């Protein structure tokens, strides 16, 4: 019987070797994803979003990285797999759309050859169908004149076209999970909308699960089913998109939403979150990591320890108890999902 969850991550931690010792970049991550669900992972740069995604893909250097916990892809354990055993999963069960296609694509290989390379790694399609499959993929992602594009190099295409090629490669072998890591960052607004629509169209056709890594809360409000908020390598809140936008609890989630400009912004002054995400050497996972950034909560931060995620209402999880005491000094957050 096919499992409802395409992804189940439990107590996942990733540590990088830095100056001879391992330092945790993400810690104790629990996430699951159903088939057909869009999960958005949000947070500032340095929060650990991409580190988690590359752990799912098995892209970390095993000599410089320690990964613990469990990551099940379609009930198959990923952690511990390397080489050919991981390559058989990557591309067939999970595909990834990277942030910058110009660096992700091989500049010395023609587009058709790069898609063919992905098909050749797996046995999903026989070799005599490679050519027709390549044209089918390019047409599916909205690239005009595929016969011309297969013989072009990445630098000969626009940014939007390169990202469409990346999507074609990611879905070449019909994976059940698609990871989109900031897929529209380098594109203009019009092309951004087209790329997001394309990803969602493919997701619905295949009933695939999608992990969308982004800092754009407007995009999250439009496309996500569930939102996971990360800060300094930890999950701090997880809920349905409606619940999170209408009833945010964790101080970091509330700060992110308040710093996002909208027509409903209460004040003319744009709220700025004080400070920055701590470096790996500064992180103490037994402390509440965000409160130390909030000037009016620093005294409270010394008293509050980091705790496990707690379900405060149906499928709404929040880390620790600090949210019960946190308030902005001037006013309550107003507004919700656009």
UniProtKB/Swiss-Prot annotation:
It is a peripheral membrane protein. Keywords: ATP-binding, Cell membrane, Membrane, Nucleotide-binding, Peptide transport, Protein transport, Translocase, Transport. GO terms for molecular function: ATP binding; ATP hydrolysis activity. ATP binds at residues 43-50. One of its GO terms (biological process) is peptide transport. It catalyses: a [peptide](out) + ATP + H2O = a [peptide](in) + ADP + phosphate + H(+). It is found in: Cell membrane. This is Oligopeptide transport ATP-binding protein OppD. It comes from Lactococcus lactis subsp. lactis (strain IL1403) (Streptococcus lactis).
């Amino acid at each position: 019987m096919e499992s409802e969850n395409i992804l189940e991550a439990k107590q996942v931690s990733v540590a990088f070797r830095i100056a001879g010792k391992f330092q945790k970049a993400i810690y104790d991550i629990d996430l699951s994803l159903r088939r057909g669900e869009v999960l958005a992972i949000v947070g500032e740069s340095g929060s650990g979003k991409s580190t988690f995604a590359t752990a799912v893909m098995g892209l970390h250097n095993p000599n410089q990285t320690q990964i613990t916990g469990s990551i099940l892809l379609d009930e198959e354990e990923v952690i511990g797999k390397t080489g050919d055993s991981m390559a058989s999963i990557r591309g067939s069960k999970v595909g990834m759309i990277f942030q910058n296609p110009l660096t992700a694509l091989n500049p010395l290989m023609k587009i058709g050859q790069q898609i063919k390379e992905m098909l050749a790694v797996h046995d999903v399609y026989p070799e005599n169908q490679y050519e027709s499959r390549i044209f089918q993929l390019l047409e599916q992602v909205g690239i005009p004149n595929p016969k011309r594009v297969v013989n072009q190099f990445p630098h000969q295409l626009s940014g939007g076209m390169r990202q469409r090629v990346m999507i074609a490669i990611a879905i070449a072998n019909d994976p059940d999970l698609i990871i989109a890591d900031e897929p529209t960052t380098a594109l203009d607004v019009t092309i951004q909308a087209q790329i997001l629509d394309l990803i969602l169209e493919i997701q619905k056709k295949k009933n695939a699960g999608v992990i969308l890594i982004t800092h754009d809360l407007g995009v999250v409000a439009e496309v996500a089913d569930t939102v996971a908020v990360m800060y300094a390598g930890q999950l701090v809140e997880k809920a349905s998109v409606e619940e999170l936008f209408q009833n945010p609890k964790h101080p970091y989630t509330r700060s992110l939403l308040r710093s996002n400009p909208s027509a409903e912004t209460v004040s003319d002054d744009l709220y700025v979150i004080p400070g920055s995400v701590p470096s790996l050497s500064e992180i103490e996972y037994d402390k509440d990591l965000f409160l130390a950034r909030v000037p009016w909560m620093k005294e409270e931060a010394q008293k509050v320890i980091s705790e496990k995620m707690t379900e405060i209402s149906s499928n709404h999880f929040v880390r620790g108890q600090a949210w019960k005491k946190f308030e902005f000094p001037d006013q309550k957050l107003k507004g919700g999902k656009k």
